[in-house]
Amino acid sequence: MTIALGRFTKEENDLFDIMDDWLRRDRFVFVGWSGLLLFPCAYFALGGWFTGTTFVTSWYTHGLASSYLEGCNFLTAAVSTPANSLAHSLLLLWGPEAQGDFTRWCQLGGLWTFVALHGAFGLIGFMLRQFELARSVQLRPYNAIAFSAPIAVFVSVFLIYPLGQSGWFFAPSFGVAAIFRFILFFQGFHNWTLNPFHMMGVAGVLGAALLCAIHGATVENTLFEDGDGANTFRAFNPTQAEETYSMVTANRFWSQIFGVAFSNKRWLHFFMLFVPVTGLWMSAIGVVGLALNLRAYDFVSQEIRAAEDPEFETFYTKNILLNEGIRAWMAAQDQPHENLIFPEEVLPRGNAL
């Protein structure tokens, strides 16, 4: 019996092959298939943000000035969220709210959903770009895996949290002072700093900063003196094959300092990857919990005792009172559409009053 081995031949001008060849060609700025998602989305997200912070008011959604045109600066300008009455509408330009009127669309907060959605897909496109390039040059995909952490935080804070609340209104607006307001809101209404997922996130981010500082200093400290240049950067050839620092010396140093030390580079660098990525993912999970109004730690026994005994107070009970103050002062200012009015006697006062 005769068996013929072979493969099907494609047409020379196959459209997919032509596109693949052009997109993945070696050029100064790599495009790739991921670029079809990344570049348009990043362009629209950044363009929408610059347009909103320059020209668009938040008077109709928050009762605020939020653009350079109205007198804001870089720290106070923002692309603000839509009004609470619009709930979770995508606010498409051609939708029933704006009906194709660009000015009305901006006034309603359409730029926020535009920036948020294009920003999310732009970040995903950037992660796919790292996957694609890693595959092209036969690297492992850990860069892309690491970048999933900030994507998780962005999606949880800007998309999932407001989806769990009554509308996009409760998401952060895109601006520096606006993010600060959102942080205060998270503390006052969710007691976020006492949430264990926030604690893990802080440990991850600050732990990663500590690891970076220690790692950079250790490598600098153990560089081989194999050149006669005046400083670190002149003393080495960037294309040299051998390593430029002594892992053995570093291991001896930290073994004497702490009693333990990393014995190989793979475990050391994986740990530097693991700490911040895990911390950010834990924060993202915590924010998803807040979207469902899950509570942080409650030390009820301390609250009861503080209520019964005026002389008993802890940092926890003080923070609970501060949160009540944030809610009382912030709700009326932050949600003008609710027409909230708090009697003077329920507003928090300083001890001197």
Swiss-Prot record:
A GO term, aspect molecular function: chlorophyll binding
Catalytic reaction list: 2 a plastoquinone + 4 hnu + 2 H2O = 2 a plastoquinol + O2
Cofactor binding note from Swiss-Prot or TrEMBL: The D1/D2 heterodimer binds P680, chlorophylls that are the primary electron donor of PSII, and subsequent electron acceptors. It shares a non-heme iron and each subunit binds pheophytin, quinone, additional chlorophylls, carotenoids and lipids. There is also a Cl(-1) ion associated with D1 and D2, which is required for oxygen evolution. The PSII complex binds additional chlorophylls, carotenoids and specific lipids.
UniProt: chlorophyll a PD2 binding residues: H198
Protein name: Photosystem II D2 protein
Taxon lineage: Eukaryota, Viridiplantae, Streptophyta, Embryophyta, Tracheophyta
Family label: Belongs to the reaction center PufL/M/PsbA/D family.
GO BP: photosynthetic electron transport in photosystem II
Entry EC number(s): 1.10.3.9
Subunit description: PSII is composed of 1 copy each of membrane proteins PsbA, PsbB, PsbC, PsbD, PsbE, PsbF, PsbH, PsbI, PsbJ, PsbK, PsbL, PsbM, PsbT, PsbX, PsbY, PsbZ, Psb30/Ycf12, at least 3 peripheral proteins of the oxygen-evolving complex and a large number of cofactors. It forms dimeric complexes.
Transmembrane regions listed in the UniProt entry: 41-61, 125-141, 153-166, 208-228, 279-295
Positions annotated to bind Fe cation: H215, H269
Organism in which the protein naturally occurs: Liriodendron tulipifera (Tuliptree)
Membrane topology recorded in Swiss-Prot or TrEMBL: Multi-pass membrane protein
Additional notes on this entry: 2 of the reaction center chlorophylls (ChlD1 and ChlD2) are entirely coordinated by water.
Cell compartments where the protein resides: Plastid, Chloroplast thylakoid membrane
One GO term describing the cellular component: photosystem II
Residues that bind pheophytin a: Q130, N143
Keyword terms of this UniProt record: Acetylation, Chlorophyll, Chloroplast, Chromophore, Electron transport, Iron, Magnesium, Membrane, Metal-binding, Oxidoreductase, Phosphoprotein, Photosynthesis, Photosystem II, Plastid, Thylakoid, Transmembrane, Transmembrane helix, Transport
Pfam families tied to this protein: Photo_RC (PF00124)
Residues recorded with modification Phosphothreonine: T2
Binding-site list for a plastoquinone: H215, F262
Main location: plastid
Modified residues annotated as N-acetylthreonine in this record: T2
Binding residues for chlorophyll a ChlzD2: H118
